[in-house]
Structures are given as structure tokens and as C-alpha cells.
Amino acid sequence: MTRQNAYTREDLLACSRGELFGPGNAQLPAPNMLMIDRIVHISETGGKHGKGEIVAELDINPDLWFFSCHFEGDPVMPGCLGLDAMWQLVGFYLGWQGNPGRGRALGSGEVKFFGQVLPTAKKVTYNIHIKRTINRSLILGIADGSVSVDGREIYSAEGLRVGLFTSTDSF
């Protein structure tokens, strides 16, 4: 795989099918759980910690599946989907670095929600700041992240942790 610094929706769908990083390696979830339409920037340098960053986007429209069921008469994107998107991006970063294994979210430190995504919104932006990657017997990414809607930050998470596992038998 040739590393790029940006990825289209088609690239991300290929990743969900296991075609981007190779069989048995990091995959994004398929729609409807794929919470990213494009990665506009990915780099091993930069970010708040100087160790890498990812900027990704999700286009919002009122027909997205979660608005019809969360909540009836009060549609809002579930906050856990934004948190999951940040984990998805940390796992993508580890695969993009060339690390082997399947991604699993392993937790996070403090998570704060101080806004919401409504069906009238246009775009969600995810900003991931890599703090550390461990590439030994365990492949682990640790990052801080934020979610913004139409330019306004609405969620933050510290210490997002994702591991890559060549075997999940004992997981």
C-alpha cells in the first residue's frame, strides 16, 4: 500500500472490506457504523503532541439512520457514535503506519460532551492528536481527540486507546 495523506469515501469503504491494509489487518467498520466520509489529512508529525494527527469529516443529512430512532421527535446523533469514530481513526492511523493486526478499542480517559449533532447540521469534523504509539508485541495507539459540528467543538476525549491484534482468540 502506498501511504497517502488523505483518503476518499471510496478508500475508506475499501478499508472496511479489508482491501486497504491487507487481509487480517486494520479495517474500518462498514456502513452504517462507518462514521467517516473522508480523511482530509493524516500525518506522522504535527498535532498537539507533535507525534501525528488526523483530520476527518462526516457529512450530515437528515436521512442518516440514527436520526429516525435517537430520539423520536428529538433527533440527535448519539454521542457514542462520535466517540467510536475517534477510535476508528486511531485504529486507521495504526494500520496506515503499516502495523499488522485487527483493531479493537481499549478505552479512553475523560470524555466530555458539551454539544450535539442535529439533522440540520452540515458537517462533523474529527481531530485526532496522537500522543504515543507502541510497536512491540502489542501495537497500541494513544491519542486525544475532539468532535466539532459546523466549526464548533462539541465533544472531547483524552487518552483514546486502540490496539491491533494478530489474534483475537483470547480477547
Curated annotation (Swiss-Prot):
Q: Which GO terms describe its molecular function?
A: (3R)-hydroxyacyl-[acyl-carrier-protein] dehydratase activity; trans-2-decenoyl-acyl-carrier-protein isomerase activity
Q: Which NCBIfam families match?
A: fabA, PRK05174.1
Enzyme active site: 70
Q: What is this protein called?
A: 3-hydroxydecanoyl-[acyl-carrier-protein] dehydratase
Name of encoding gene: fabA
- Return the InterPro entries for the record: FabA, FabA_FabZ, HotDog_dom_sf
The record's note on quaternary structure and interaction partners says: Homodimer.
- Its chief place of residence is cytoplasm
Q: Of which family is this protein a member? A: Belongs to the thioester dehydratase family. FabA subfamily.
SUPFAM superfamilies per UniProt: Thioesterase/thiol ester dehydrase-isomerase (SSF54637)
Q: Which GO terms describe its cellular component?
A: cytoplasm
Q: What is its EC number?
A: 4.2.1.59, 5.3.3.14
